[in-house]
């Protein structure tokens, strides 16, 4: 039906003038490290949980990044730990008061000063995604060498939102040969976590754990009228995978995300249509909140799915 490019390639000049229908991959959240590096506060984030650690006598130290690729993530030590992190006694199921623990930045660990002996504890924390997980996947699988790690930025946040709309218009004006813009995809990636050896540690194509930030969560709280807890996402470490019965709070969060994402999708597809081009969506990758089987998708303005 059409000729296209793909991740890791550039469209050859020889094919631009042959009169064929052309569609081009377009990345809304990456392939612009200059912007990402200039605006680190609007880097994408995710929730992650540590393994279970058992207390004995005295304080318990829980390292946050054990089992997680440091190429992929780094601890968000910028936002308020007490507000957005959660330390839970998994033996009782109760969260600890923020006064009962502290963060040691030098070791990237949480220290519980007086845990209950032989109880198990976890830490749920926010981490910045410093390498787009799909780009990491493509790089690892294809054994790409000397490739700059693409940093994903959060289109939901104010500065990046405004920049993204301007960037899309500039792209359309500089690519007149493109007939179809194939968004790959929109704003939030499914849950994809790698370990220190670049192995896939946890994958859930329907996971919402990488669609979070304090900015987004504050908006969610205003809409639903109750306080957000990391446990709504973490779900005892199951991350609300499709074998779990979702809580009311998690379903509220999903519905909120779909409404917000579909509205932002419409903003971008309207721009594409204004330039006389079609808007196509890749089914996968950054598709959280874009699920075509949910009712909110109908208002997104997408012309096709591939």
What is each model feature region?
Residues 1-306:
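Glycan-processing catalytic domains of CAZymes
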């Amino acid at each position: 039906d059409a000729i296209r490019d793909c991740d890791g390639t550039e469209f050859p000049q020889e094919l631009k003038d042959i009169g064929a229908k052309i569609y081009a991959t377009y990345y809304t959240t990456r392939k612009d490290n200059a912007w990402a590096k200039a605006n680190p506060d609007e880097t994408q984030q995710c929730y992650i949980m540590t393994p279970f650690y058992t207390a004995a006598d005295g304080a318990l130290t829980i390292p946050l990044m054990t089992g997680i690729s440091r190429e992929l993530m780094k601890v968000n030590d910028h936002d308020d730990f007490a507000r957005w992190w959660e330390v839970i006694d998994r033996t009782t199921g109760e969260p600890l008061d923020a006064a009962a623990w502290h963060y040691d930045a030098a070791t990237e660990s949480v220290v519980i000063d007086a845990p209950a002996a032989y109880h198990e504890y976890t830490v749920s924390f926010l981490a910045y995604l410093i390498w787009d997980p799909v780009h990491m996947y493509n790089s690892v699988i294809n054994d790409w060498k000397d490739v700059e790690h693409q940093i994903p930025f959060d289109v939901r946040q104010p500065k990046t939102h405004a920049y993204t709309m301007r960037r899309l218009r500039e792209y359309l004006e500089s690519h007149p040969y493109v007939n179809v813009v194939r968004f790959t995809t929109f704003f939030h990636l499914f849950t994809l976590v790698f370990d220190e050896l670049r192995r896939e540690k946890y994958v859930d194509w329907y996971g919402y754990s990488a669609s979070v930030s304090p900015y987004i969560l504050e908006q969610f709280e205003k809409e639903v009228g109750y306080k957000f807890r990391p446990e709504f996402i973490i779900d005892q470490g199951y991350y609300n995978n499709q074998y779990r019965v979702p809580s009311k709070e998690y379903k509220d969060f999903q519905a909120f995300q779909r409404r917000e994402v579909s509205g932002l999708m419409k903003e971008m597809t309207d721009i594409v249509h204004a330039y006389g081009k079609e808007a196509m969506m890749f089914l996968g990758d950054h598709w959280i909140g874009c699920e075509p089987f949910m009712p909110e998708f109908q208002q997104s303005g997408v012309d096709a799915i591939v």
